[in-house]
Amino acid sequence: MRKLIILALAAIGFAACSNQPKVMENQAINTIMTRVSVREFTGEKISEAQLDTLLRAAMAAPSAINKQPWAFIVVTDEAKIAALGEALPYSRCSNKPAVAIIPCGDLSKAIPGEMANFWINDVSAATENLLLAAHAMGLGAVWTGLHPDMNRAKMVQEMLGLPEHIIPLCVVPVGVPAEQPEIKDKFKPENIHYNGWE
């Protein structure tokens, strides 16, 4: 009898707990909160289906006036990945990624005139989608910047034969993680200001 009472109380307790809102149980929120920058890879290949999913996720991003002013340079050639790593040591392309994806702004698709630089916002949103998709699929990735350093951007343009209207925003190495970086809580209440700066 005592055992039955204990089991009943445990069941009631579990039911009560399960009714409490738990944000981290939401898969999308959990992916956002647990994403980390992965800089070391095993060298294993990823499948075409995985690569397709990454690029579809990137292109699902919002863009100003729905211009979608982006292009994605997908580098799978090992020699070219190594060359990127040599030219851009911070890019982590020497750390055995399966692929290096370079999100770019396509100025021929950008909003004309004074709003042309909105492509930076748009391609940044696409890049974040790419990072989140990689994490959700059990892959690792890291955002390594090029733009607005036009010397770096120009170097990549020349290395990959990109036309002048295709501006590389960053290099994103993607692969099977060889490390598990610590998940950090970056939330800081002092960064929040309601109804103005107070």
Question: Where do the protein language model's features map onto the residues?
Answer:
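Bacterial Sec-dependent N-terminal signal peptides
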Residues: 1-24
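Acidic, surface-exposed loops and disordered segments
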Residues: 16-198
